[in-house]
Amino acid sequence: MSEAIIAKKAELVDVVAGKMKAAASIVVVDARGLTVEQDTVLRRELRGSEVEYKVIKNSILRRAAEKAGLEDLASVFVGPSAVAFSNEDVIAPAKILNDFSKNAEALEIKGGAIEGAVASKEEILALATLPNREGLLSMLLSVLQAPVRNVALAVKAVAESKEDAA
């Protein structure tokens, strides 16, 4: 192999390792058997949630995982592999890929990493069942508003009872 090709591959390993280090979550899938139309729809959905989706050779993924400190992730790089990286939303790639796999049986989640820790297929699927960031924030807001609303209702009830008494 020429030195130019080796240098390009080494650069690609560095780029992928950088993406792995920076990613909040990584999901590895086997996308073999997806039609072009399904793949296009999947990529569009992922792009809409700011998730980067790439098909990369396993040898490059293994080396990048080792360089990123995710040595245990190398075991899922068997057979055709596509990788989804998300720097912001931890749940988005798992949720989108899991939802998509329900309609496209050819898509199979293999495993991944969550905030720098290797995750099994089961852990990724469990992550996919959680609500996304906006859903979690709305739940938090509801929990925070409930006591304030209850106090407001109690004050209103006291005021109404005093008006009735007067």
UniProtKB/Swiss-Prot annotation:
Q: Which PROSITE patterns match?
A: RIBOSOMAL_L10 (PS01109)
Q: From which source organism is this entry? A: Streptococcus pneumoniae (strain 70585)
Q: Does the keyword Kinase apply?
A: no
Which CDD domains does the record cross-reference, listed alphabetically?
Ribosomal_L10
Query: Pfam families, alphabetically?
Result: Ribosomal_L10 (PF00466)
The entry's keywords: Ribonucleoprotein, Ribosomal protein, RNA-binding, rRNA-binding
Disulfide-bond pairs as recorded: none
A GO BP entry is: translation
- GN (gene name): rplJ
Q: What does this protein do?
A: Forms part of the ribosomal stalk, playing a central role in the interaction of the ribosome with GTP-bound translation factors.
Record's Gene Ontology CC terms? large ribosomal subunit
Q: Name one GO molecular function term.
A: structural constituent of ribosome
Its quaternary organisation is: Part of the ribosomal stalk of the 50S ribosomal subunit. The N-terminus interacts with L11 and the large rRNA to form the base of the stalk. The C-terminus forms an elongated spine to which L12 dimers bind in a sequential fashion forming a multimeric L10(L12)X complex.
Q: Which family does it belong to?
A: Belongs to the universal ribosomal protein uL10 family.
The membrane-spanning stretches of this chain are none
Q: What is this protein called?
A: Large ribosomal subunit protein uL10
